[in-house]
Amino acid sequence: MIDWIMDTSKGEEAEWQSVNHATVNSIGLETDLQLTIHRSKFKVSYSYIHQDKEQEVGIVSQYALEYLRHKLVVSAHLPLIKHLSLGLDYRWQDRVGSYTDFEGSVNHYKPYMVTDARLTWQQTKWKAYIEANNLFDVSYRDYGLVEQPGRWMIAGCSLRIP
């Protein structure tokens, strides 16, 4: 597998370089369960990946050794009153690997949980919604050094033109 790696045993001389780094075998599974009760819909999804490549001491990988090992999503779509519905999504993710911060320290990814919610008002020819992502303002890094946004909201509408 071609990857960007850094050999930290070289200390200050360590540089990122693109190399044919490793052979990686992956195995995984993905499953989901859906349930509809009256007009309410519930769904649980889970995926798992295992790679047999062990992380080498002193080698920091940019891509090959970082992957999402566990992902669990629990969703509910609930009608509240006529035309108004609530969608809730809970996501738990556990990523394997590490990233290098601006000071040069190697940090391992931490599992995190995020909850999103969406209120939708739907008519025959139009719908409007307001959505809150990362509802509980969780601080996390999903990939690399990039810190993901805290709580944020969006709103929108759509028209159906015959």
Where are these regions (language model features)?
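Long, hydrophobic alpha-helical transmembrane bundles and adjoining juxtamembrane helices/loops
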Residues: 2-3
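Conserved small-residue
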Residues: 6-9, 88
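A short alpha-helix capping/helix-coil boundary motif
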Residues: 9-11, 28, 122-123
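Gram-negative outer-membrane beta-barrel transporters
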Residues: 13-100, 156
